[in-house]
Structures are given as structure tokens and as C-alpha cells.
Amino acid sequence: DDSLTDKQLAWAFPVDRGAVLNIRDIEQGVENLNSVGQNKATVALNPGQDQGGTLVMLNNQLSRRWRGSVGINNNGVASTGEYQLDSNLVVDNLFGVNDSAFVSVSTNIGPHDLPHAMSRSYALSWSLPTGYWQWSLQNSFYEYEQTVLGDVVNFSMHGSSFNSSIQLGNTLYRSQTGKLDLSVGFIRKDSKNYIEDVFLETSSRVLYVWYLTTSYQHFLEQGTISINAHLYKSVPWLDSKRQLVSAEDDFQFTKYQFNIGYNTYFQIADQAVQYAMMADFLYSPKVILASEALTVGGRYSVRGLSQGGLFGYKGGYIRNDISIPLQTDWPWPGQVQLFAGIDAGLSNLPEYPQKRSEWVAGSVLGFKLYDRNFSISFSYARALRVPDFLQQKQQEIDFSVRFNF
């Protein structure tokens, strides 16, 4: 039906015409095609004209090659602006080889407590699957400006961070019930900070980081299990430094990260229920930079601990979520999702030498209204356990509105 070109098929499938049929190769090729959002490919195996031959039939439902969204949320902080506006765009098959390009922009909007505050972020990425290999390039840039209130005089601060990475992955093994991937990557991280246009050498750094990731995904009858192990190792190359001043410790680091995820679905009294669990653990043999350490508490770890939490380099957290999708007969929304979650996390405390470790817990309750082009979500998160030394809000209300085009 001309929805797939010969070039796309050649890049997607790790097979040659006339070769011995391997069903795993076919599955890999279909997965590569469907990694592009505009494709929805399925495969059927039919008898070939020659004895012992097989005809591989592909059917593809082709949709628009680009899509995007615009949204607003209140995930910022009061000092620099609680409300955030963001937009993103995805372009599929940019070079005609099943590749995808992604670009996003976000900025703070609305009132803020500081006299002047601006923050913006930009991201650009590109990915390409070919046979059993996967390539990806990622770039992100963040900049900020703000006026800080002093006891005598106000002063201005500004800065930026620019991260670039390249990754190469390979599917080492796949079966009917699972697959094993190995990837290696390299990251450059560059941060610059200024006070009154004076460069802050002690808080500005260039880091080069190698990483190695092993991922296994197991397909269940009603769900999946994913396991990921990461090794990160910084190296003092080129314009990076081991230390900025003689009194500072060597900030080159090695850290290990382990993630496990599980999701499934079941029914209770004819009502579909979805359950998801995610655990993330980090270990480093010595103190590492705050930007590379673990934060246990916040929207993306233990919910309910607003704008902060435990900081360390040995610990982790577990998140549990249950969601109930509901179909409606209303003109809008076509679908409603109710969700609830409970989280817990533990970390060592290098900022509090008298304490070895502490733990926190939190919860969330909310709903999402959505259809194909528009969605609204609302959630209320509350801390269930917070150590006395953490002086911060123990609840938060989040909302977001998003339009897809």
C-alpha cells in the first residue's frame, strides 16, 4: 500500500531477502517500524509459492508524520514562578529511515515572589533503530535569571546548563516472552553560574560521563516487568577538572543505579483496574555532586513532599499507583481516569553527619479527563511521614491542562 518504503524496510529488518526465516528477526523489524509514532504495523506469515518458502505480509496503518502538544501546569515554585508553559513537537521519519526527532520548549509564566525571575529550557533529540541496533542523540539547554533579595541591597544571578549525550544500544537477546538490551553512552554536562556578571568558578563545572546500561523486559500475559542496571563513571577529560580549588574534594564520581518496574491490569466486578510499581535505587561509594545524587521527595519520587526531600548518595524509593479508566457517554470528556498512589523512600544524610539515614512516605489522589486532543489532570498529594528536620510544605495540589495537535 506504499505506506512503507523499501528503504524503511531495509533499515528496520535485520534480514535479507531469501534468507532463512527467524521469527525473532521479524518481531524486531516490526518493533523498529512501530517505534515511529506514525506507523502501526502488523505482520502475517503466509505460505510462499516455493516449497518451504514463507511470504511475510506487512500491514501498516499510516498516520500523520508529525504531532505536538501545548500545556500549562503549576509545577514551578513560588519564588521564580509557579506556572509553567511548555510545548513539544515530534517529527517521524525525518530522513526516511524510521527515525524520530523531538523538540520541546518550556518557560515560567505569571507572577513570582522575586522582583525578577525567568527560566527557560529547550530540548532536542533524535533516535534511529536499525536492525538490532539503536542510536540516539540528546541535547538540553536551561537558562535562568533572577533578582535575589539581600539584607542591604538586591543582587542579580543568572546562569545556564547545557547537556549533550550520544547512546548506542543493541538487543542481545529476544524471545517470545522477553528481550535483553545493552547500551553504552557518553554525556557532556556544562554548567555556568554568575552573580552580578561575576563568574562563579566553584559552582560552575564541566563533566564528562560514560555510562553502561543493561535492560531486561519480560512480557507477562497481563503486564510487563522491566529491570535496568546502570553504571555511571565520570572522567577528567579536556576542559573538565578534578577539583576547582585545593580545599575541594575530587568531584569525579562513580555511581550505580538500579530500576525495576512492574505493571499489570485486572478486573474487579467487571471494572478494569491498572496497577504499576516502580522502584529506583542509587549507590555511590563516596559523596558526589548534588546534581548527580539522589533526592527522595517530590513530584518524581515520593509525592507529597513539596519542593524538596532527603538528599544523599545511598538510597532509593518505591512508587505504587492504581488507576481506574472509565468510559463516559458525555460529549466531553470521552474518558476519565481515577488514580491513587503511595510512595516511600530512604536515603543516607551527608548533610546531617549525626544522622545515618532517614525515610519518608507520601500519597497522591487525583483524576484525569481526556480525549484525543485535550486533557485536564488534577491531583492532591500529602506527606505521610517526614523527619522533623525537614522544614517544608507537606502537601501539594497539582494541575495541568494540555492540548494535542
Task: Identify the residue ranges that each predicted region occupies.
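Outer-membrane beta-barrel "beta-signal"
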Residues: 89, 367-374, 393-405
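Transmembrane beta-barrel strands of outer-membrane/channel proteins
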Residues: 45, 70-74, 101-107, 137-143, ...
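Predominantly transmembrane beta-strands of Gram-negative outer membrane beta-barrel pores used
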Residues: 69-74, 83-109, 120-143, 167
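Residues that define the transmembrane beta-barrel architecture of outer-membrane proteins
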Residues: 52, 81-85, 118-122, 160-164, ...
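C-terminal outer-membrane beta-barrel translocator/porin domains of Gram-negative envelope proteins
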Residues: 194-335, 342-344, 348-350, 389-391, ...
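Transmembrane beta-barrel wall of Gram-negative outer-membrane proteins
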Residues: 114-216
